[in-house]
């Protein structure tokens, strides 16, 4: 589905509180939060869908994925490309179906599974889990890629 504007530029950190699969609150700069809320309302009204739904999320697992141009040059292309990089945690929101209509991109996230970090600051912790460690043993060419994953994700500050 297409709509304009396709995205909202967020210049400062905005926090989203999610409860039981719904966006309960957004906090941050009042003007930016207002722009985000307006965008959600516009999209939900256009398609007759629930605006506060958080459908699903996934983190990137492709250490070779890079994006060498800027996110600002084409935000839609950026969000549909860079989500496979391990530095990116990608949420599907707005609508009760995959992938939803609005995505969130969380950069350099930490994600824990059963109390252990599977991602730490945007890097996968592959040696800490039997299944991922086994993948590195079965396909040793992956070990080098994960040891030095691509850092370029179109944001200009690519060092982590």
What are these regions (language model features)?
Residues 1-160:
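Metal/cofactor-centered catalytic core regions of large enzymes
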């Amino acid at each position: 589905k297409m709509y304009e504007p396709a995205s909202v530029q967020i210049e400062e950190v905005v926090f989203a509180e999610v409860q039981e699969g719904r966006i309960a609150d957004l906090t941050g700069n009042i003007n930016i939060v207002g722009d985000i809320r307006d965008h959600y309302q516009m999209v939900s009204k256009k398609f007759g869908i629930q605006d506060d739904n958080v459908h699903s999320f996934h983190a990137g697992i492709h250490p070779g994925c890079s994006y060498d141009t800027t996110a600002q040059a084409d935000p839609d292309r950026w969000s549909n490309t860079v989500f496979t990089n391990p530095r990116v945690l990608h949420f599907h929101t707005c609508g009760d179906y995959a992938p939803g209509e609005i995505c969130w991109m969380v950069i350099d996230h930490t994600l824990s599974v059963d109390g252990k970090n599977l991602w730490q600051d945007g890097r996968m912790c592959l040696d800490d889990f039997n299944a991922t460690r086994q993948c590195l043993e079965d396909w040793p060419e992956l070990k080098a890629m994960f040891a030095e994953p691509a850092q370029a994700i179109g944001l200009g500050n690519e060092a982590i």
